[in-house]
Amino acid sequence: MRRKKGPASSSDHEEPPESDSVIPETPETKRPSGSSLSTAISDSDSDSDSEISGSSMMPVRKLRPRKRKAASSADEYSVSDEEEEIVVKTKRRPTHSRTTRSTSQQAQPAHQKASETVTDIAHPSPLKTSGMAAADSVQQRRRQQMCGSSQESDSRKGGRVSAADDSEEEGQRSKDQERMLRKLQRKFPHLNKNELRDVLQEHDWLIDDALETLRMFSDLVVESEDDSSQTSTPAKHTRRVAETRPQAQVTKLSSPPKPKPSRPLDGTRTSQRIAKQPILAKYTYVSSEEECSDSEASVVNGLLDSDSDQSEETLSKLKTEILCFFQSASVDELTLIAGCSLKKAQKITELRPFKTWKDLDDAMRRRNGLSAELLAGCREVLKEREVVKGLMSKCEEISVKLIQDVTQVMDKGPGSMTQPEILSSTFQLKPYQLIGLNWLVLLHQNKLSGILADEMGLGKTIQAISFLAHLYQEGNHGPHLITVPASTLDNWVRELNLWCPSFKVLVYYGSADDRKYMRYEILNQIVEYNIIVSTYNLAIGNSSDRSLFCKLKLEYAVFDEGHLLKNMNSLRYRHLMAINAKYRLLLTGTPLQNNLLELMSLLNFIMPNMFSSSTSQIAKMFSMKSSEEQSSFERDRITHAKLIMKPFILRRVKSEVLKQLPAKEEQVEFCAMSERQQELYSALLHKLKHSSNGEKRELTNVMMQLRKMSNHPLLHRQFYTTEKLKAMSKLMLKEPSHRDADPALIKEDMEVLSDFELHRLCQQYSALHEYQLNTDVLLDSGKLSLLTQLLNSLKEKGDRVVLFSQFTMMLDILEVFLRHHKHRYNRLDGSTPMSDRIGLIDQFNTDQDIFVFLLSTRAGGLGINLTSANVVILHDIDCNPYNDKQAEGRCHRVGQTKTVKVIKLISKDSIEDTMLRIGERKLKLEQEMTATQDGEEDTLPDDMTTLLKASLGL
């Protein structure tokens, strides 16, 4: 009975620092004046403007921890990447030789150093070239680590830790890295997330070093903006550096030599970097409230303060836009400005109207909690809007091109759209599926990826297989990767073999040893294949799995149930993004689930080259919560989203393309809780509402406890009191397996179990048989009472039922209920072995005597065909209504011949009432996105916390 505690997670231990690490960089405040310029700008091997973009724009200085040594150690004097080779060679020399050389270098006149600078730029020494090459090789190795290539590190570890420990350690490390990344995002909101990640990686995820570099980078860009306004020759740049050098290096010969700065001060890299300052400047906007320097604020406010006394007609375009924004923006939009809290936003709305620029400027400087920095922050918001508008323009151009291509196809007549010849002649694509196939072909011809978002049951699997068959017929034999949920793996393999026998399909599935052998065969080209089929969990299961799909050169990566990629900040999203595929195709019946930002995450996944540079702007524009006060820009969000998604998403609903598909009827049954259940629910609600702050649990836990009680009382521990558990723990000593156990520990373990789990424990051990629950207690639930009448009525009509529940323990209780009423059933949940799932589905579809199919909503709601049933009962609804929609689609799909009835069981006057209302509001978002006519956007309060608190009275 007593559960043993497992070993401590390996994630609690960190890898020891590398022995050849570099001395930490000298803090800027302790450096001699004039040296910050040389340490602040990023290094680049090329002067080409085209190469300075994205992450290469950021400083790439690698700072690794080093143990501090005595001041006399020769190792402290040379730490730059270029001089690594010098450090290695001079470690064996006497200390005085290095001191003499260092002193002589410091004594050189400034003009001599300037001439050496020009010489080094034109003719870099072989030693420095090799150092730079070594630095490049280090950077290249680190880039490879992003693809999960950790086989070399695994071999060095030599089996000290198990694969499970590696996974736990990597998971903890990923969480720490995400935490550091979020911290940098808060401090530098104007920088791209991918750029911040690159900076952290280049500094070995040392956040202090990354922060210091980013601060210096931010200060330097402001200087570069000032410098770019003056026309200066390269010679002047060099002379300025040379003139500042004596201040940084003047040292008395009699005093001990000081350690060199962590970067070379010979002027070589400094001159190269200065030439690139204007390029860096154009990527920098206004800094956030936390990190905004005085120089940046003065630059922005200086621009805005000029001509502030003039009339509105003569204001610059920028001032006019800012004035309009502060005059018309909602509170939600005002909070998008860096440093503008909700309180400040409300204050701004109270001070309206702002008829002229002077009115706005005076309001910001009136010591009312506002500041002129908000005007500068407004520029950033306006620039973000411009980025989104530019993205929409690109998408609109693509749409026009695709429409022209579609028109040409339509002009050729319907006969031009035929299914590939290599598809099995036994099957025939439906007209709308042929349209989907041709849409995918057009995307491919334009070198675009896409999202096939047809409603559940319209045959997205078949359309994807047909498209891959078309590529095969055109000479593109792959390889392709199809990533699917575990519950649909067998179905995909079956459909591939049925529809296109020409494909050589490899199923990447099995234990760790099985997959290791398969990786060996794949990488050594021992096995032939066109398509690899795997699951989400195994495709990124461990570093070796991820490394395989980074090394393979895939043509297409197809992701079934693509809405699983809705969170661009998740670890799964990042790992799957690293798969080396030329194109990506997402299949999802529910592209819109909670908000527009999730849709943008899907678009960013399929077209990272187009969307990744605008990720932060898109996140701000589309993650804004709606409110009763809606501005014109906020009302246009759905219109903007439609324009952006139009070229990349094809969505058809059943009512449009399947006129012959039977109707779907939906009804909600409000079930009154049983007398005892109502008492327990009220007591639990009272306890949660009146608990002290120290005892009050998180809202999600409160919600879960109320959900369980509204479904069945036995999901809590109410019947088995503490006195009963004490008696039961003593009886357990009679069992041979627990004779030497401690009754107190047995009782402690029993206290965490629910009533139903304790009931099954009593069934398992003969000593506890007398404590089993009777049938009346097991079936004491309002929903089960209604279900008794409902199933009897459906059985008499000859209907067959698919019964869904969120909780596997509720499925256990439903099994007891079905056996009691003598109903035949099958059951499938997340614990069902993969090898058994397809057999259970086939058995239900062929054996008409099986009345009910029990399914868990998450495991059984994806990609399963159960058209032999015509009634769907949702015993308990999901917080996400689209998961319930997926479950409904198991029956209402191609092949259904009867009217499908969907019945939702809702416990009356419970938490489920609120969940139902939230779900209905979320579904309105999809209706707006798929509407053919524009209309006003309804209020979509997606703040579940507020609604739940209101319903609970908390």
From Swiss-Prot:
Enzyme class: hydrolase
InterPro entries tied to this protein: CUE, Helicase_ATP-bd, Helicase_C-like, P-loop_NTPase, SNF2-like_sf, SNF2/RAD54-like_C, SNF2_N, UBA-like_sf
EC nos: 3.6.4.12
Residue ranges constituting the Helicase ATP-binding domain according to the UniProt record: 441-609
Ranges annotated as biased composition (Basic residues): 61-70, 89-99
GO cellular component: chromatin; nucleus; site of double-strand break
Positions of region (Disordered): 1-195, 223-273
Residues holding ATP: D454, E455, M456, G457, L458, G459, K460, T461
Motif DEGH box location, chain numbering: 560-563
All residue ranges annotated as the CUE domain in the record: 176-219
Subcellular location: Nucleus; Chromosome
Low complexity: compositionally biased ranges: 33-43
Composition-biased stretches (Basic and acidic residues): 170-181
Helicase C-terminal domain location: 786-948
Catalytic function, reaction form: ATP + H2O = ADP + phosphate + H(+)
PANTHER family for this protein: SNF2/RAD54 HELICASE FAMILY
UniProt function note: DNA helicase that possesses intrinsic ATP-dependent nucleosome-remodeling activity and is both required for DNA repair and heterochromatin organization. Promotes DNA end resection of double-strand breaks (DSBs) following DNA damage: probably acts by weakening histone DNA interactions in nucleosomes flanking DSBs. Required for the restoration of heterochromatin organization after replication.
UniProt-recorded name of the protein: SWI/SNF-related matrix-associated actin-dependent regulator of chromatin subfamily A containing DEAD/H box 1B
Species assigned in the record: Danio rerio
Record lineage: Eukaryota, Metazoa, Chordata, Craniata, Vertebrata
Gene behind the chain: smarcad1b
